[in-house]
């Protein structure tokens, strides 16, 4: 029996194979994308930035009378430009802490986000109702060096308004609290201790750079103490009670 070669049939088979191959790749890509969306579905929390940033920018630009925040203790705190290092590390501290929990533990990420977003929202409301600022920044620096240059840069970018309570202080406390309650990080005491030291230095930096009054720091500490039980203590009591019931 003689078989006839049909070039059109061969071409059709090849096209079917190519189509099946491409379809398989597309299906795998879609499946992987769905898996990533499901895995990182808590990314919706980041949409809070669309609320916070426009509101904060409005507060920074609006023309109004600001109540000056000042404490007698501020006059005894010297200007120390070297604290610009921990002050700037705040941005790294928050970013790394947030990213760590985002990619490793959804529950801890939600608690960190709840703590930060609650305090930042209260901050926005306070500054909207009670416009505030300070007049603590030095007119001239006692020394000229790379650190004072960095401070000068921060002064030019950040207005001395909307300072009560201090978000630098509050968010540092939030990051430290999240790290302290992390089960995985409890195995790495060096990381925890290092974060506590950095957090404390960041808090100190706000007053030594004259970016905040001691009043702003106290207000941030008070706000953290009020929100902490709702985010951490209450939740952990519920979890402990549930585990006891299961036993």
Give the residues covered by each predicted segment.
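Short, positively charged and aromatic/hydrophobic N-terminal segments
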Residues: 5, 17-23
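N-terminal transmembrane-helix/juxtamembrane module of multi-pass inner/ER membrane proteins
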Residues: 22-94, 142
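Membrane-interface loops
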Residues: 60-73, 102-186, 238-247
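Aromatic-anchored segments of alpha-helical transmembrane domains
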Residues: 53-55, 120-128, 197-207
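C-terminal membrane module of polytopic membrane proteins
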Residues: 213, 219-247
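Interfacial helix-loop-helix junctions of multi-pass membrane proteins
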Residues: 140-141, 159-164, 201-227
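Membrane-embedded alpha-helical segments of multi-pass membrane proteins
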Residues: 86-93, 167-171, 218-222
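Hydrophobic, membrane-inserted alpha-helices
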Residues: 93-97, 173-178, 198-205
């Amino acid at each position: 029996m003689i078989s006839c070669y049909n070039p059109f049939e061969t071409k059709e088979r090849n096209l079917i194979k190519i189509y099946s191959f491409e379809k398989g790749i597309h299906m795998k890509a879609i499946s992987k994308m769905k898996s990533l969306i499901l895995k990182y579905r808590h990314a919706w929390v980041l949409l809070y930035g669309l609320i916070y940033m426009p509101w904060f920018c409005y507060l920074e630009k609006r023309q109004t009378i600001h109540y000056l925040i000042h404490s007698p203790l501020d006059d005894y705190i010297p200007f120390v430009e070297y604290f610009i290092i921990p002050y700037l590390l705040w941005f790294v501290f928050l970013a790394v802490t947030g990213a760590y929990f985002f990619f490793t533990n959804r529950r801890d990420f939600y608690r960190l986000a709840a703590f930060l977003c609650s305090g930042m929202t209260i901050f926005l409301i306070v500054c909207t109702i009670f416009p505030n600022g300070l007049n603590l920044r030095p007119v001239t620096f006692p020394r000229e060096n790379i650190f004072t240059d960095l401070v000068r840069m921060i002064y030019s970018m950040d207005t001395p308004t909307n300072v009560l309570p201090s978000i630098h202080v509050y968010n540092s406390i939030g990051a430290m609290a999240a790290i302290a309650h992390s089960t995985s990080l409890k195995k790495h005491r060096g990381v925890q201790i290092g974060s506590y030291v950095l957090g404390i230095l960041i808090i100190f930096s706000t007053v030594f750079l004259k970016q905040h009054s001691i009043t702003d720091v106290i207000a941030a500490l008070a706000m953290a103490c009020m929100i902490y039980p709702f985010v951490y203590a209450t939740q952990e009591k519920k979890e402990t009670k549930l585990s006891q019931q299961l036993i």
